Amino acid sequence: MNEKRRKIVKFISAELSSICARLGDVEDEEQECVDNTPENLQDTERYTHAEECVEILSDARAEIETVIENLEGV
């Protein structure tokens, strides 16, 4: 791979890192919401959806981190 394409890949990797950090911020905020939900509301659909969102965000971040690691080998 030539230098120009390597720079593009490095730029994309940096952008993915930024996206991953932003997703982490959203995940942390949603987790805080889940953690602070009163016990009497923990059996609601909204609470369950919030828990699912935290898991989805966590999984997405893990996938992005894997992509970033793979790009480091380029």
Predicted region positions:
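Long, low-complexity or tandemly repetitive, helically biased scaffold regions used
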Residues: 1-74
